Amino acid sequence: MMTQSIRRSMLTVMATLPLLFSSATLHAQANSVQQQLEALEKSSGGRLGVALINTADNSQILYVADERFAMCSTSKVMAAAAVLKQSESDKHLLNQRVEIRASDLVNYNPIAEKHVNGTMTLAQLGAGALQYSDNTAMNKLIAHLGGPDKVTAFARSLGDETFRLDRTEPTLNSAIPGDPRDTTTPLAMAQTLKNLTLGKALAETQRAQLVTWLKGNTTGSASIRAGLPKSWGVGDKTGSGDYGTTNDIAVIWPENHAPLVLVTYFTQPEQKAESRRDVLAAAAKIVTHGF
C-alpha cells in the first residue's frame, strides 16, 4: 500500500479493482471522487476532512486527511475504549459504581440526570457516553481514568501519535480554528477506530462490547448513516461543537463486503454556525459509492 501526505488539493484512492480496469479508469474514478468532495466542501462553506479504510485490502480514500480537526464527542470512543482496556485485567471493573451528583451535570446529560443522588456503573457510563453522547458520562469516564492526559496516553499505547485530549466536557467542544487542543486527523482516527473495533487493540469480549455500544448509537441517523444503503450495518459516534463543527466516525458493514471504517470531520468559519449533518451524509455517499 502506498503512503503519502495528503494535501488539500489531493485525494488518494488506493482500491483493488478487477484487472480489466485500466489505469486510466482508476485515475478517472479517483478524479471523480476528488471533484465531488471538493465541490461538496466548496458549497458547504466549511472545511471537510474524510478518511475511509477498506478493510478488505487496507486501501484508503483520503481527503484533507492529515489536517487537524476538533474531535468533539467523537473522542468519547477513546475514553470508553480505555476503560474497556482496563477491564481486561479486572473482570468486575465495568460493574464498579460511580456517584452522580447534581453538581456533576453539565450542558447535556440525558442519561446521567436520571441518576442524580444515585450511582451508575462504568458500563452504564460507557453506554451513556457512546449511545446518547451524555457529557457527564464522558466526564466520569475521564475522571475514572485519571484525566484527559490518560486518554491521550491510551491512544499512544495503540500507536496513535496524533490524538490529543486536553479538556473535559463541554469545553473540549470549543473547536477554535487553529487550536490544537482536543484534536486529531481523520486518518489517525480512522486507523485507531479500525484497531479498536476490528483489530487486536482490545480483547475479544471488550472489542465486542465497544462494537455493541457503537451499533446502538441513537444520535447518528442524519449523519454517515443517512448516506448509506439502509441494509448496511453501522456503528458510529457523532460529535458537534462551536464553529458549526459536525463530526461522525463509523464502522460500516456493507452487504457482501468486508467492513469499512469512515471518519468525516467538518467545521466552519463562524463560531455560531449551525451543524451540517447533511454534509457528512453527502460525503459518506460519495466515498462509499461502488461498495
UniProtKB/Swiss-Prot annotation:
Catalysed reaction equations from the record: a beta-lactam + H2O = a substituted beta-amino acid
Keywords of the record: Antibiotic resistance, Hydrolase, Plasmid, Signal
Active site: S73
GO BP terms, alphabetized: beta-lactam antibiotic catabolic process; response to antibiotic
Leader sequence segment: 1-28
Leading EC class: hydrolase
Transmembrane segments: none
GO molecular function: beta-lactamase activity
Binding sites annotated in the UniProt record for substrate: K237, T238, G239
Enzyme Commission code(s) on record: 3.5.2.6
InterPro entries associated with the record: Beta-lactam/transpept-like, Beta-lactam_cat, Beta-lactam_class-A, Beta-lactam_class-A_AS
Record NCBIfam families: bla_class_A, blaCTX-M
Family note: Belongs to the class-A beta-lactamase family.
Function description: Has cefotaxime-hydrolyzing activity.
Remaining remarks: The class A beta-lactamase family has a specific amino-acid numbering system, sometimes called Ambler or ABL numbering and often misspelt as Amber. A multiple sequence alignment was used to derive a consensus sequence and then the consensus was numbered taking into account insertions and deletions. This allows use of identical numbers, e.g. for active site residues, despite differences in protein length. UniProt always uses natural numbering of residues, hence there appear to be differences in numbering between this entry and some papers.
Annotated protein name in UniProt: Beta-lactamase CTX-M-6
Species in which this protein is naturally found: Salmonella typhimurium
